Amino acid sequence: MTDLVPVYYAFAGVVAALLFYKWQSDPLRAIPTIGPSAPLLSYLGAIRFFKDASGVLQEGYDKYNVFKVAMIDRWAVVVSGAKMNEELRSIPDDQMSFMDAADELVQTKYTIAPDVLIHPIHITVIKEQLTRNLAPLFHEVVKEVEAAMQELIPAKGDDWIEIDGYSTVTQIITRASSRVFVGFPLCQNAEYLRIATTYSAEVMKGAMIMSVLPDFLKHIVGPLLPWSRRALRRAAPFLLPIITERRRLLKEYGRDWEDKPNDLLMWIIEEARRVGREDSTDLMVQGIMASNFTAIHTSSLTFTHALYHLAANPEYIQSLREEIEEVIRTDGWTKVSMGSMWKLDSFLKESHRVNGISGISVMRLALKDVTFSDGTFIPAGTFVAAAATSTHHDEENYSDATVFKPFRFSDMRASESEKNKHHYVSTSAEYIGFGHGKHACPGRFFAANELKIMLASIVLNYDVKFEDEGKRPANVWFATTVLPAPGAKVMFRKRQT
């Protein structure tokens, strides 16, 4: 056995030499690193990033225009500041791809059904039909939000009740979104709603597992992940009978018939027909569930952040009420009139700015070698993103940048030259909560509409506070995801004034 000791040492030396050579020749080595960058030691940096992404990103933002951080399965390059954000988003798609970056981050080929990745018909529908139909569907969303709140926030008289903030918000958003996605009465079916709600968590569970595996194991473990496939199987019995009947009516009557449904599922069926996939009912089910994934998870986090601000600062409720009631009294309660509720819009935009739901945005995957204007070389295959939270907390972009000022953006719009700017859904190099440019979140118009209806409904019907008045529970970072404090309780009572 002792005769083999020199062999072991020689083998270890060869491995060390190979790792050192790979490190020395890595084109990313020239980019400053937050944390250790040497072979093996970089995994310590990845662990730190997982535990303290906020601190790591802020350190890099304060020091460098471009820096890199270690993730378990890759290096991520991060750009700092509005100028670099603008440069990143303007790089052509054939050089840096948003879709490929999203696929990498969520590991979609293992966590999302493959058919809808090849034929993402739901994205076309969300960009076009859903956005065009926000006004006709406005009162459907209002009715579902009001019904859900009466059931889930059953405050009576002058008694305060306590509810779990995030859980309740998620249930309301799932019902309101489902009203638009699949229509009534399925939007109120408890078992279907449970499947729709848990699908997002199951996709993210799979993505987290895949993100810590080396590439050679991903091909083995990925096909074995059960959760999202199981959710699709469970959703199918609810959706397939509706799809079958609507396809029959479409075949019999053509594009129009009396009482034709006006919802996402109908548009997905028609889009599948348009692209020659009219017989692929599995694709239609996958399209609905993929839409649930993008809508429910992100909107629930976003609105819970805003609800926590409202509960911590109930003194702002009266100003919001006065604006909402004045607009309704003058113009009615419609999608168009809601555009006049500047303070409502500003409250949500400011909450999104201060908190966000991710520390990074404007994600891209380099398809070719790219060189930034400052000379930084990005080799093909590199994951690149902008530092979202740090951008939003930058004093060069916003005064008192870390302070929540609910009417910051409505005050900015008071100037004649600014009144058509600073909408919640607007993006810029300084405001990247929805991404920026042509790849900004296509569902943000629907999401903003839904969240404004929810916030207005709460303000008009309830008083809100935390038991520990005036104190907002701290956010929790899970890698780059920014979570509103899990399990935090919010106090509600019927409006008293």
From Swiss-Prot:
GO cellular component, one term: membrane
Primary location recorded for the protein, binned into one broad class: membrane
Coiled coil (UniProt feature): none
Signal peptide start and end residues: none
GO BP, one annotated term: secondary metabolic process
Subcellular location: Membrane
Family per similarity comment: Belongs to the cytochrome P450 family.
Role according to the record: Cytochrome P450 monooxygenase that is able to use dehydroabietic acid and testosterone as substrates for oxidation, suggesting that the natural substrate(s) may be structurally related to steroid compounds.
Protein name: Cytochrome P450 monooxygenase 151
Organism: Postia placenta (strain ATCC 44394 / Madison 698-R)
